[in-house]
């Protein structure tokens, strides 16, 4: 058998509108349960929904950002099923006339650039939230019921978990660029379900599709897909097709667990939402939105390469995160050194971000202070070792590095007579190293430079020490 994997994603994104999708209730995370509710989002008889125009605009922005076709007219539908978080007994969504269709995301880190098609992006309302307390009871919070969502459905074009993760990360960053959602998986504003099965390229054999829910982090998406891929491969090797089912990822056991047999579309008994009339979207409105879209990662990457003369790899990393790209441009504006700004950000700064286990947006250090540090280093007012030490201190404290290095006496010594005196002392104290250098062992120069730096208490210029040692010998 020549087994291949098929992976598709269904991604829900909560939109950052001020109010809910079909009523005037506030759209706010973390409020007292059941305070942001009204007869409309609770489904009381006679309460009529009305479309949130800002949510519609945000959905069109998303569609355009993923190169989708935007419908000029659409209707809303009722998706009917019984579950405690669905207080009305149905969800207002779109079944057969989605707002956006035929988009794509291009993956960059595959062996070659690969387009993953986006089948559709449709608008809908979110459901309530189940809260399980310590007593074993389940309580319902309907603050989330009616919050505007877009559901982004990909085609099953991904062939391994790495591609699926890259697709999800690329999608999240593009949504963040649009500023239509904070896309925080930890708060549920970005949620992902995955569909996976395997097939044999040499026959018509294929396993039945599994849908995995309860994926609340990029790590859980990757782990669930790796597990399911192995499970489906094993089924195929045993010539079994498995069951079409919905599963969930269990963090404790690091496995997927069956929740229920997967429902077919007609189980939901879709019907037209009669309380919301068909909506018409003028092409001029779509064009106006398109014209005002922010600069997206791909466009910004090209600009960074052309304007700042940095290489493609650095430009790609810098522009994947909108906050990082903005931060970089602020640093460049002050430091007037695009290359060194890129080197510091992608090197020592991101290293501190990773070591502190935070997001780049949570960093305290201002762009202004980082730029000042870069200028101090580039002007040789402090050496590289001192600059790195100051950065580690400044990362969390966010102080002015110019003031700090003066107060701490860290400015680099530029008195040639003093530097020569230190070199003379070190050379006199290390005759064996001098002999090694004269015998062709250049590594000993590094040792002598280190001794000079030690005597200067880190304030000397290592390049200058290197030159003076060679002249002395």
Curated annotation (Swiss-Prot):
Recorded GO MF terms: asparaginyl-tRNA synthase (glutamine-hydrolyzing) activity; ATP binding; glutaminyl-tRNA synthase (glutamine-hydrolyzing) activity
Record-listed E.C. numbers: 6.3.5.-
A single BP term in Gene Ontology: glutaminyl-tRNAGln biosynthesis via transamidation
Transmembrane segments: none
Keywords: ATP-binding, Ligase, Nucleotide-binding, Protein biosynthesis
Stored Gene3D superfamilies: 1.10.10.410, GatB domain, N-terminal subdomain (1.10.150.380)
EC primary class: ligase
UniProt superkingdom: Bacteria
Stored SUPFAM superfamilies: GatB/YqeY motif (SSF89095), Glutamine synthetase/guanido kinase (SSF55931)
SMART domains: GatB_Yqey
Keyword ATP-binding recorded: yes
Catalytic activity, as annotated: L-glutamyl-tRNA(Gln) + L-glutamine + ATP + H2O = L-glutaminyl-tRNA(Gln) + L-glutamate + ADP + phosphate + H(+); L-aspartyl-tRNA(Asn) + L-glutamine + ATP + H2O = L-asparaginyl-tRNA(Asn) + L-glutamate + ADP + phosphate + 2 H(+)
Record-linked HAMAP family: GatB
Its job: Allows the formation of correctly charged Asn-tRNA(Asn) or Gln-tRNA(Gln) through the transamidation of misacylated Asp-tRNA(Asn) or Glu-tRNA(Gln) in organisms which lack either or both of asparaginyl-tRNA or glutaminyl-tRNA synthetases. The reaction takes place in the presence of glutamine and ATP through an activated phospho-Asp-tRNA(Asn) or phospho-Glu-tRNA(Gln).
Xref: PANTHER family: GLUTAMYL-TRNA GLN AMIDOTRANSFERASE SUBUNIT B MITOCHONDRIAL AND PROKARYOTIC PET112-RELATED, GLUTAMYL-TRNA(GLN) AMIDOTRANSFERASE SUBUNIT B, MITOCHONDRIAL
The family this protein is said to belong to: Belongs to the GatB/GatE family. GatB subfamily.
Assembly with partners or alone: Heterotrimer of A, B and C subunits.
Name of the molecule in the record: Aspartyl/glutamyl-tRNA(Asn/Gln) amidotransferase subunit B
Organism: Finegoldia magna (strain ATCC 29328 / DSM 20472 / WAL 2508) (Peptostreptococcus magnus)
């Amino acid at each position: 058998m020549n087994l291949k994997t098929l992976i598709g994603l269904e991604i829900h994104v909560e939109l950052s509108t001020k109010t809910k999708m079909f009523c005037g209730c506030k759209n706010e995370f973390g409020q007292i349960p059941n305070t942001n509710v009204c007869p409309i989002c609770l489904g009381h008889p006679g309460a009529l929904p009305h479309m949130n125009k800002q949510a519609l605009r945000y959905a069109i922005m998303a569609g355009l950002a993923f190169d989708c076709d935007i419908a000029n007219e659409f209707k809303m539908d009722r998706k009917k099923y019984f579950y405690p978080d669905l207080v009305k007994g149905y969800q207002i969504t779109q079944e057969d006339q989605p707002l956006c269709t035929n988009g794509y995301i291009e993956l960059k880190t595959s062996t070659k650039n690969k387009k993953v098609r986006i089948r559709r992006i449709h608008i809908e309302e979110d459901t309530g939230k189940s809260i399980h307390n310590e007593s074993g009871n389940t309580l319902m919070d309907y603050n989330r019921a009616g919050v505007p969502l877009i559901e982004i459905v990909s085609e099953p074009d991904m062939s391994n978990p790495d591609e699926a993760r890259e697709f999800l990360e690329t999608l999240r960053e593009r949504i963040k660029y649009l500023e239509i959602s904070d896309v925080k998986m930890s708060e549920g504003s970005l949620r992902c379900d995955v569909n996976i099965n395997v097939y044999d390229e040499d026959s018509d054999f294929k396993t039945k599709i599994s849908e995995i829910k309860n994926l609340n982090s990029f790590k859980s998406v990757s782990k669930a897909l790796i597990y399911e891929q192995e499970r489906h491969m094993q089924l195929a090797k045993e010539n079994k097709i498995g069951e079409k089912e919905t599963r969930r990822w269990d963090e404790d056991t690091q496995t997927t667990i069956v929740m229920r047999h997967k429902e077919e579309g007609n189980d939901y008994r879709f019907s037209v939402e009669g309380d919301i009339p068909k909506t018409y979207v003028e092409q001029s409105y779509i064009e106006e939105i398109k014209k005002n879209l922010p600069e997206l990662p791909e466009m910004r990457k090209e600009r960074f390469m052309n304007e700042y003369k940095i290489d493609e790899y650095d430009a790609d990393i810098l522009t994947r995160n909108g906050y990082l790209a903005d931060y970089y441009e602020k640093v460049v504006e002050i430091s007037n050194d695009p290359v060194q700004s890129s080197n510091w950000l992608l090197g020592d700064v991101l290293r501190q971000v990773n070591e502190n286990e935070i997001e780049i947006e949570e960093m305290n250090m201002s762009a202004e202070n980082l730029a000042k540090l870069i200028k101090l280093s580039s002007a040789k007012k402090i050496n590289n070792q001192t600059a790195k030490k100051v950065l580690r201190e400044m990362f969390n404290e966010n102080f002015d590095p110019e003031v700090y290095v003066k107060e701490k006496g860290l400015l680099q010594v530029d008195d040639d007579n003093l530097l020569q005196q230190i070199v003379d002392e070190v050379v006199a104290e290390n005759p064996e190293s001098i002999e090694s250098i004269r015998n062709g062992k250049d590594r000993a120069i590094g040792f002598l430079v280190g001794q000079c730096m030690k005597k200067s208490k880190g304030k000397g210029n290592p390049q200058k020490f290197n030159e003076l040692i060679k002249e002395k010998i």
